Amino acid sequence: MHKLPSGCGRVLKAGRTVCVMDRVNEIRSTEDMGVRPYFRLTDAQMRAKQRPEEAIFIAEGPKVVKTALERGLKPLSFLMRRKMIEGAGADILAMSPVTPVYTGDDDILEAVTGFRLQRSWVLSAMARPEEKTPEEVLRCARRVAVLEGIWEPSNVGAIFRTAAALGWDAILLSPDCSDPWHRRSVRVCMGSVFTVPFARTGEDSGIGLLGALGFDTCGMALREDSVSPDDPTLRKAERLAVFLGNEDHGLKDATLRGCRRVIRIPMAREIDSLNVAAAAAIALWELRPGRG
């Protein structure tokens, strides 16, 4: 790894000059230690369950990285194309003036990340915030989405974005749900994971705790004893939790037995189900805060 020439690449931020090139490192190989978070670490290693203080995630894209920085998340490094450093990425670097920056030829960067580079391309390895407990995120919540066994990161990300846009207060995730900090999930949600409080549940997907806290619990499923999500009694519920199930098998039988009601979206043309992210968007819209 090589340092680029110093004394150049300065940008003006809030009336002060910030040197960029003094902290830019040129990578020559995927073996360079500085790019290990972007290439060598598996999702499980990024979670670092044994040492939570070392857990990281990857923010991708200028908007997502900026949102993370504005929310106070701690960047450990940046990885970006050379033209971004003094171009569109300059504002990002000025927001974190001492964080190391890594760059290199496009073929090296593509080998590191495993995908083709876009024009405005930037990644940042960031420290994960401390995890919250279900009790913490539910304390003042009135509308909660519960994700059970949803394994596709893009679906998790899409649901986070919908929940943020429609004003839902919190999200709970079962132990077998995809990690909300997965790079693809963070990208799809456009940083909503930074703004919507969330927590992992126990094996019961939190249904016991939600019931004890007075939530009206509703599971989405293809059952005859269901109601539409625009049901007036659901809209008027003071505290409501909507359970969304696995892409292939839906909610567990035990979860549905624990739910007070079952929701089913009416459909036409002999279509019986939607992608879980699409179904979530409809249900969360119909049951959004203040709709009753």
Each model region followed by its residue ranges:
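Glycine- and other small-residue-rich loops at beta-strand/loop junctions that grip anionic moieties
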Residues: 27, 57, 148-149, 174-175, ...
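Amphipathic alpha-helical repeat scaffolds
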Residues: 61, 151-159, 274-279
